[in-house]
From Swiss-Prot:
Keyword entries, A-Z: Cell membrane, Glycoprotein, Membrane, Transmembrane, Transmembrane helix
Transmembrane parts of this sequence: 72-92, 111-131, 146-166, 169-189, 200-220, 228-248, 302-322, 341-361, 379-399, 406-426, 429-449, 472-492
Start and end residues of each stretch annotated as Disordered: 1-65
Species classification: Eukaryota, Fungi, Dikarya, Ascomycota, Pezizomycotina
Organism of this sequence: Fusarium sp. (strain FN080326)
Protein name in the entry: MFS transporter fsa7
GO CC annotations, alphabetized: plasma membrane
Subcellular location: Cell membrane
C-alpha cells in the first residue's frame, strides 16, 4: 500500500495510515488500491460492520476491470470533452452571419456568442464536480449530456440574440461536466503508472477541439449556415450519449462501496453495516463541503493555484491567437476564407506530435524512476519542453509582421501547439496524481475555474493589443508572459513534495 499524501487530510486518516510504509505517494492511493480484508496488513482487527473491497483483486473495483472496459470508458469520456470543445470554436466562423441575422451592431456582443460558452466551463464545475464525488460520476454524465443536447437544440433554433446567449452559457455549463470530472474517472480507472497515456487521450478534446472547430465550422457556415454547426454538434453528442448509457458504469469508489454496503444490509438484515470512510454528516453538509472543495484548493494550495494559472494563460493565449488568423492569412497572405481556416492545422499538428511524444515518454519515464514515483515526476517534460511555447509566439509574430513566406508563421503556430501541450497535459496529470481519485474532480474543477475565464475573455484584448503594438511586439508580449511562468514546473519539481506537506488542505 502506498502512503497517503499529506496534501489531503480527512477525519479517517488514522484508518488509512494503519499498516502502511512511508512511500510518499499520492493522496488517492488510499482509495485507489483495494485493501486486503484478511487483516494481515493492519495493527487492529477490522471492524466487522465496515464494508470494504474484497481484497486487492476485488473484480468490482474499477482498477481491476478489464483493459477493454477501462479503455472504452476512457474513449467515451474523451469524446465528451472533444464535443464540448469543438462547440467552443466551431460556431466562431458563423458569428458574423448570426450578427447580421439578428441585427447585432456591437462587436462585444458578437464576441460574447463565443466567450459566454467558454465562461460556462468555469461556472459548471463548481457544482458538477462536487456532485460527482457525492453521488457518482455516471449520473453527472447523464445529466450533463441531457441538458447539453436540450440547449444545443435551443441554440440551433434561437430567434433572437438574448435567447441564443442564455442557451449558449447553459450549454457551456453542461459541457464543463465531463471536462471537470473526466480526470476523476481517469484516476478511478488507472493506477498512477498508467495515468500519463490515459490523461493524454482525455486532454485531446480541450487542446484539439478548439483547433479543429473553426476548420469544420468555416466550411459548414459557408455552405449551409451557422445553425448547422449546432446540428452537427447535436448529432455527435447524441451518439456519445447513447454510448454512455450502453457501455459506461459507475467508477466512483465511495459510491460503489455505498452500494455494496446497501446490498449487504439488505441481504444480511444488519443495519449497522456502513461503507469504509463514511463520514458522520448529513447530505446537506456533504454537499456544502464538496462545493467548497475546489475553492479551498485554489486558496490554500499553491500547487493548484500556480499550475492552474499557468495552464489558464496558455489556454487563453491559444484562443487569443485564433483571433489573428483571419487577418494574418487573409489580409497579409491573401488566403480565401476557407483556405485561411486551414492555417489552424499548424497548431493542431504540433499538438498531435506533442501528444504522441508525451504518450510514449510520460509513463515510461515514471516506471524507470528508482523507488516510489512522486507526482512531481510528471513535471520533467513540462520543465524542458514547455518553454518552447514563447519561441513559437516570437516566430509567428515577427514573420507575419514582415510577411515572410506563409509557411514560416504556420511553423511558429506548430511550435506553440507542441509546447502548450507539454504544459497543459503534465499540469493536469500533476494535479490528479497529487490528489488522487478522492479529490481529482475537485482539483480539475479548480483548474477549470481559473483556466476558462482566460479562454473566455483574453481574446477580447486582441484588438487593442495588436492595434497598439502590431503583430511583432503584440505576440512578443504574449511570449514574455509565457516566459514568466516557465520557472513554475522547476520550482514544484524541487519543492512540490515539501509544499504538499506544508500546505495541508482539509477536504
Amino acid at each position: 500500500m502506498a502512503t497517503k499524501d499529506p496534501a489531503v487530510t480527512t477525519p479517517d486518516d488514522s484508518q488509512l495510515e494503519a499498516g502502511r510504509g512511508n512511500t510518499g505517494n499520492n493522496a488517492g492511493d488510499a482509495l485507489e488500491k483495494p485493501s486486503s480484508s484478511t487483516g494481515t496488513m493492519v495493527d487492529e482487527p477490522a471492524d466487522p460492520n465496515v464494508v470494504d473491497w474484497d481484497g486487492p483483486d476485488d473484480p468490482e473495483h474499477p482498477l481491476n476491470w478489464s483493459k477493454t472496459q477501462k479503455n472504452l470508458h476512457l474513449v467515451i469520456v474523451s469524446l465528451f470533452t472533444l464535443a464540448a470543445n469543438l462547440a467552443a470554436t466551431m460556431f466562431a466562423p458563423g458569428a458574423e452571419e448570426l450578427a447580421t441575422e439578428f441585427s447585432i451592431t456591437n462587436s462585444t456582443v458578437t464576441a460574447m456568442t463565443v466567450s459566454l460558452y467558454v465562461l460556462g466551463f468555469a461556472l459548471g464545475p463548481l457544482l458538477l464536480a462536487p456532485l460527482s464525488e457525492l453521488y457518482g460520476r455516471l449520473i453527472v454524465y447523464y445529466g450533463c449530456n441531457f441538458v447539453y443536447i436540450a440547449f444545443t437544440i435551443g441554440c440551433a433554433f434561437s430567434t433572437n440574440v438574448a435567447m441564443f446567449l442564455v442557451f449558449r452559457i447553459i450549454c457551456g455549463c453542461a459541457a464543463s461536466g465531463p471536462m471537470s470530472i473526466g480526470g476523476g474517472t481517469v484516476a478511478d480507472l488507472f493506477p498512477q503508472e498508467e495515468r500519463g497515456k490515459a490523461m493524454a487521450l482525455f486532454t485531446v478534446g480541450p487542446l484539439l477541439g478548439p483547433v479543429i472547430g473553426p476548420i469544420i465550422g468555416g466550411f459548414v457556415s459557408e455552405n449551409v449556415g451557422w445553425r448547422w454547426t449546432f446540428r452537427i454538434i447535436l448529432i455527435f453528442s447524441g451518439l456519445i450519449g447513447v454510448a454512455t448509457v450502453i457501455f459506461m458504469r459507475e467508477t466512483n469508489y465511495t459510491v460503489l462501496l455505498q452500494r455494496k454496503a446497501q446490498r449487504a444490509r439488505k441481504e444480511t438484515g444488519n443495519d449497522k453495516l456502513v461503507p469504509k470512510l463514511t463520514r458522520n454528516e448529513t447530505p446537506k453538509q456533504m454537499l456544502v463541503r464538496a462545493i467548497v472543495r475546489p475553492l479551498k484548493l485554489l486558496i490554500f494550495s499553491p500547487i493548484v493555484l500556480l499550475v492552474s494559472l499557468y495552464t489558464g494563460i496558455l489556454f487563453g493565449l491559444i484562443f487569443l491567437l485564433f483571433t489573428t488568423f483571419p487577418s494574418v492569412f487573409q489580409d497579409v497572405y491573401g488566403f480565401s476564407p476557407g483556405t485561411a481556416g486551414l492555417a489552424y492545422l499548424g497548431l493542431g499538428i504540433g499538438m498531435i506530435l506533442g501528444l504522441v511524444l508525451f504518450s510514449v515518454l510520460s509513463d515510461k519515464m515514471l516506471k524507470q524512476k528508482s523507488g516510489a514515483a512522486r507526482p512531481e515526476d510528471r513535471l520533467i517534460l513540462m520543465k524542458w519542453l514547455g518553454p518552447v511555447t514563447p519561441l513559437g509566439l516570437f516566430i509567428y509574430g515577427w514573420t507575419a509582421k514582415y510577411a515572410v513566406h506563409w509557411i514560416v508563421p504556420i511553423i511558429g503556430t506548430f511550435v506553440v501547439g507542441f509546447g502548450s501541450l507539454f504544459v497543459v497535459i503534465p499540469g493536469q496529470i500533476y494535479l490528479v496524481d497529487s490528489f488522487g481519485a478522492e479529490a481529482a474532480a475537485s482539483a480539475m474543477a479548480a483548474n477549470l475555474l481559473v483556466r476558462s475565464p482566460f479562454g473566455a475573455f483574453l481574446d477580447l484584448t486582441a484588438s487593442p493589443l495588436y492595434e497598439s503594438l502590431g503583430l511583432g511586439w503584440g505576440n512578443s508580449v504574449l511570449g514574455f508572459i509565457c516566459l514568466l511562468f516557465t520557472p513554475v514546473p522547476w520550482f514544484f519539481y524541487t519543492y512540490g513534495e515539501r509544499m504538499r506537506t506544508h500546505f495541508k488542505v482539509d477536504l
